[in-house]
Amino acid sequence: MNYQAILNQIQGDIQPYLGQGKVADYIPALAGINPSKFGMSIHTIDGITATIGDAQEQFSIQSISKILTLTMAVSLDDTNIWKRVGREPSGSKFNSLIQLELEQGIPRNPFINAGAHVITDLVYSHFDDPKEAILAFTRMVSMNDSISYDYVVAQSERETGNRNLAMGYFMKSFGNIENKVRDVLDVYFHQCSLAMSCTDLSKAFLYLANEGVLPTSEKTIITKKNSDRINALMLTCGMYDSVGDFAYRVGLPSKSGVGGGIVSIVPGEMVIAVWSPGLSESGNSLAGTKALELFVNYTGKTIF
Amino acid sequence: MNYQAILNQIQGDIQPYLGQGKVADYIPALAGINPSKFGMSIHTIDGITATIGDAQEQFSIQSISKILTLTMAVSLDDTNIWKRVGREPSGSKFNSLIQLELEQGIPRNPFINAGAHVITDLVYSHFDDPKEAILAFTRMVSMNDSISYDYVVAQSERETGNRNLAMGYFMKSFGNIENKVRDVLDVYFHQCSLAMSCTDLSKAFLYLANEGVLPTSEKTIITKKNSDRINALMLTCGMYDSVGDFAYRVGLPSKSGVGGGIVSIVPGEMVIAVWSPGLSESGNSLAGTKALELFVNYTGKTIF
Amino acid sequence: MNYQAILNQIQGDIQPYLGQGKVADYIPALAGINPSKFGMSIHTIDGITATIGDAQEQFSIQSISKILTLTMAVSLDDTNIWKRVGREPSGSKFNSLIQLELEQGIPRNPFINAGAHVITDLVYSHFDDPKEAILAFTRMVSMNDSISYDYVVAQSERETGNRNLAMGYFMKSFGNIENKVRDVLDVYFHQCSLAMSCTDLSKAFLYLANEGVLPTSEKTIITKKNSDRINALMLTCGMYDSVGDFAYRVGLPSKSGVGGGIVSIVPGEMVIAVWSPGLSESGNSLAGTKALELFVNYTGKTIF
Amino acid sequence: MNYQAILNQIQGDIQPYLGQGKVADYIPALAGINPSKFGMSIHTIDGITATIGDAQEQFSIQSISKILTLTMAVSLDDTNIWKRVGREPSGSKFNSLIQLELEQGIPRNPFINAGAHVITDLVYSHFDDPKEAILAFTRMVSMNDSISYDYVVAQSERETGNRNLAMGYFMKSFGNIENKVRDVLDVYFHQCSLAMSCTDLSKAFLYLANEGVLPTSEKTIITKKNSDRINALMLTCGMYDSVGDFAYRVGLPSKSGVGGGIVSIVPGEMVIAVWSPGLSESGNSLAGTKALELFVNYTGKTIF
């Protein structure tokens, strides 16, 4: 297939959707983004690439970073992790404390905020300098040493992060956070602030399309089984409270962030990254979701 | 691949798991089943079949019938249906009323009981004799005119169905059941009582592996898009409250029933049906889930 | 004190509040009431009476009937009753099913609908003709043999009672309803339909102001201890989801109904009954609550 | 009545109950208490006093301090307070976050922990040195300048207070905490650590039995209306999740603490304070509740 032609087609189709939705505005650094931005990038495991629009522009990857820390965590300790966090869809908002109370401080899955805190806490316990470790891992998989944290965003998150603090202390009260809550959240807010482009992202997650092996470096990042499992978790839990709707429309393991990015995996074939800051009510990029739906319609590349 | 050889291998591997778990005992007709039963059947879209064990023996398909009525419903009216039932995982027990109250009588998806009631209600409204229509559809897709309801099971369900009645009247109070609650549940209890074998099931659902077209008769049952969507719903909502765990271990769109049956779709390739009455705590066949996990390990046929 | 003068004063004060609020309209028989109706009646245990406005006019007592059946139930069996229903405020709407699910079919108290169903079920089990028994008890305490059910209201309730049916079947599924759900609810809908006047009500509940003894007939209805307890339950659970606000403003054990009636007990002294059909958001008579607040302000007769 | 004789009688009756229940052990300072301690004290508004047992011994008043700060808050600002905290029983545990989420950060009442945080936050905003102000108020109403904070207890609370921190940050995320969460909780943990005796307590709260006026000093602490209202809140919300059961058994406006203290008001007459460290499952002093029940049985002094 001529992926570049398909992306070009999508760029035309997507125009009416640009600027729709609501840009995340809970911190000033995100609120200032131009809502009409749109970029899309593909990397296949065979080395084919295609890009359109603002695919080279860095943005705040936010919750997409949860795949990075989850990958690190399963490679560090893939047994204990599942005693501290579940693998089921939550059926409720990404930042709800209700389920956490009903289920005694065990978050439903690693992609809701509380679950991501636990994963970051686990990573935290394994490194002297966890922020450095996460950054090194990110640069390694994306083969881009210029990637870094956006300290302005991280600081903003920290200042407005009362609900994340509430979750952290709540889990701590159940004994499910090992380190100091503020220290874990400091790392968490930094990972969310990672500034990456669509091109970075579609390259970085190729190991999830290639049975755990990064085709660019032939390095094994995780086992095939764990790669399959992360894909399964992305499909069932990766898109906030609209995983079902997204699976229904797009049907690819995916993870979104409130910065407007979405990463989708076509197992055995490729990674697609898309970015557009306007969000739907469920917190996923509105034009990004539409672009992925078009991509699947044009290529038939759904897992179903 | 030599599917028969793989099934034979699985039959050996599975022996330690037979008789484990708990047979559904809320009605006498199900409680009396021999817990060591085990059958498995494959139908590929190319006409290859393989079976082992009790694959020809009929059992109560229970919630697997929800795929049959959902298929009928989307072919009858695939727009209004999604105003009355969601497409998201529930994050709670299949028969919980909590979410129904919080979300004003709109069930989370068509595979929890409340959602299935709405689907049956929708089917009910389109036919003079809905029980006859569902039976005719089932016989047609499975190409087996001897399939019928088990009236003893249906009667037992009705006598113990207080929680289903509670759900039905609760949704009726929100205006989300059109017909008489008792009439809709009478049809629902009958569809659950359908007695089918693994062979029947792996043949019947071939249209979900073949873009909506039944390869046995070349008849189009639903559109490709709707076929993809039912697969997506099965993956995200088909295995009660362990969809995430099942996707993590097996990774195929599947639907289970408390009779011990599970149907799994390998899109573009085949349908696998398995039956063993012992249930895990989440209500899915314990040996059946293990058999599917082994099948995926031996064949690599996961969607991830 | 000159209670008649105080009631006259209140009748003047209350004029701006008449017609405010929303008349219960879920059944036609209630929706047709003139919203400006207002009546108030006092009976002291010493035989003093005072009335104003529409105090002689019969209206649908609705949930006030829950005191009648609770009184019957505690006199029939005051030990087992508290295994089947709690004594705590619910913290949620009178017809919520959420708590019922979280607490395994045991309603929080006898004054939410589910709790009242259990009480009616208990009464039902003790009589050949429970409807006749409840009516006889009501006539006895109010010394008015002309009181009867309003069969039009009862029939309307039955036709729109889907949520009550949902609760009944839900508790039945937990084993907490002994008789047939429809039979119990038939009695429940009849007790709610009882047509009584303010005068009837302030006379009927004098036993709750007089340590369990009806001063009019010197008949012991219940023990002093049980009388105290029903007053305590009325104070903590009698006013739907605004018991705290009502205790804060009025401070008397009270029970309201969606027909617009409220009964308040001044222990050791008197019973006050008030009626005005316009309801506040919490489902209590708006002018009735105001009238009681004025009464307490003028007389200082609060229990606090 | 001869109150001393009645207390002496109770001291005999209560022996079998001493040492029953479970001493609060979440902090070492509380866990070390002798579970057989028992004291009881009465102060009437006419100046009569009576004491038994360990009535002079200081203990940690814990949640009883919520009456002190609520009294300060209503005298400082009795309008805005009710926009930030409700007046309804919670129907759930004293430290639940579920309701807080469902009701957008507005706690149900001032006596659950979250509600007490809001009250302390409000007091905090009015004073340069809020800890000093609370201590001064406490000494003033109890006429005992030797009362002070137990800094060991306060420090222990702070170290184990993750759940309180979770609540604080959660409400902060809804905008319902004005000051820094840690600062407010520091004050809160100190007020909970106040060491007072039964005698101190029965003297301190006389204003609630005397229409807002402290009879010892003839000082008006709050208006009669606010005094009635605090009594109403104590009755409907003061005993954790067993207010209904307590009202049923004792029937007096009361507030308990996990230190084993309970304060009960007989409006117009007296205050009773009781202390015994063994707690029932609901967190109230077991022998203390029994002693109050006996007192009401012997004296008939219930509000119902």
Curated annotation (Swiss-Prot), chains A, B, C, D:
Catalytic class of the enzyme: hydrolase
Keyword Magnesium: no
Keywords per UniProt: Hydrolase
Catalysed reactions, semicolon-separated: L-glutamine + H2O = L-glutamate + NH4(+)
Entry EC number(s): 3.5.1.2
Gene Ontology molecular function terms on file: glutaminase activity
Superkingdom classification of source: Bacteria
Record GO biological process: glutamate biosynthetic process; glutamine catabolic process
Binding site for substrate: 63, 113, 157, 164, 188, 240, 258
Subunit structure: Homotetramer.
Protein name, as recorded: Glutaminase
Organism listed in the record: Cytophaga hutchinsonii (strain ATCC 33406 / DSM 1761 / CIP 103989 / NBRC 15051 / NCIMB 9469 / D465)
Gene designation per UniProt: glsA
